[in-house]
Amino acid sequence: MKTLAPAVLPTYARTDVTFVSGEGCWLVDDAGQRYLDFGGGIAVVSLGHCHPAPLAAAQAQLERVWHTSNLYWTTPMAELAERLSERFGGARAFFCNSGAEAIEAAIKYARKATGKPGVVALEGSFHGRTVGALSVTGQPAKRTAFEPLLDGVAFARPNDVESLRAAATAETGLILLEPILGEGGVVPLDTAFLAAAEALSRELGALLCLDEIQTGVGRTGTFFAYEQLGVEPDLVTLAKGLANGLPIGALLVADSAPEGFAPGDHGSTFGGNPVVCAAASAVCDAIDEELLVNVRARGEQLRAGLPNKVRGGGLLLGLELYRSAAEVVDECRESGLIVLSAGETVLRLAPPLTVTEAEVDLALSILQEVLG
C-alpha cells in the first residue's frame, strides 16, 4: 500500500501491514499472515470481525433502505434508541457517526441545558480531535498546534478531589470524565472521585457526562462501566464498539436531565443511518449476561498471566512496561499478535469480547516471550 500513500493525508503513522480479511479474533494480511487481534480496532470490534449477527442485520437492511435523512423516521434508528433507553433508565438518544461527534453534542447540550459554558475535564484524557472535543482533551501534545481552542475549559488531576473542585467555577456547566482514561494510560477513576464529581455537578447545577466511548458496550464487564461505579450520570457518550466497526456515535441523555436540544439545535446528516443502526441493535442484543461473564473471566485470565502491574477493567487492560511500548507493539505484531500502546510505557489490550480461553492463552504466551 506504500504506492498509494501519496494520495492519503499523513494523519496516521500507519504500519506497513495491509489487512484483507478477518473472522472472530483473527485478521489476515495480504501476504496470508494470520494475526491474533488483541487491539480490536482500538476497542471497536466488540463481537469480533465479521460477526454473523450484525453482518446479517446490516445485509438485510441494505436490501430495504440505506438513507432517508433525519427529516423522517426509520425503524432501525427508533429500535436502537429504545434498546439504549432500556439500558440507561429511559434515556433519550442522539445519533451521529463517531465519538468526537458525540462529545461535541454533549458540550452543546450542556451549554444549552445549563446556560453555562464552562467545562471541567481531566489531565491525560482523550475525547477526540475535532475542535470542541480537542478543547476538552487533557493532552497538550495533541492540543498545542491548534490553539487557541474553546475558552472556559479547565483540567483536574485524575482521582484528585481537591484538584477537581479547584478547577470548577460557577460557570461550569459540564463535568466530563472517562471512567477509564484509555489513551491516557488505562487509568481507572476510583469510586470516591466519581462520587465527588457527581456531588459537585449537583452543587453547581452542572451536568455530569461519562465518556463511555471506549469503556461502554460491555467492554469492562457490564454494558456501561458506570454500572460498577455507584454513579448516575446525566449524559453518556458511546461510539467505538456500538456497531462492531460500522461508524456510529451516540449521546444518551438521562430522563432526569434538564431539557437541552429543540428541533434545529443540533443534527447529523448520516446520524442514525438505518444500516448502521440495524447492526448496532444486533450488537446490543448480543451483549447478554453470558457474554459479559466471558468478558470478566477472560479479563481475570489476562491479569493472572501478565507479569507486570495491570490496571483497567474487563477486557480493557493496561500493562505497565519498563521499556518502550511502541517497541513491544512492533515485536508482538512480528510474532502474530496485535496489541496497542497507551502512552510511552503502557501496553493496552482490548480484544473482542468474544475472545476464548484458548486465544487468551495464546496471547499470553506471545506476550511472555516478547516481554521476557
Predicted regions and their residues:
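Conserved N-terminal phosphate-binding loop of PLP-dependent enzymes in the Aspartate aminotransferase
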Residues: 1-372
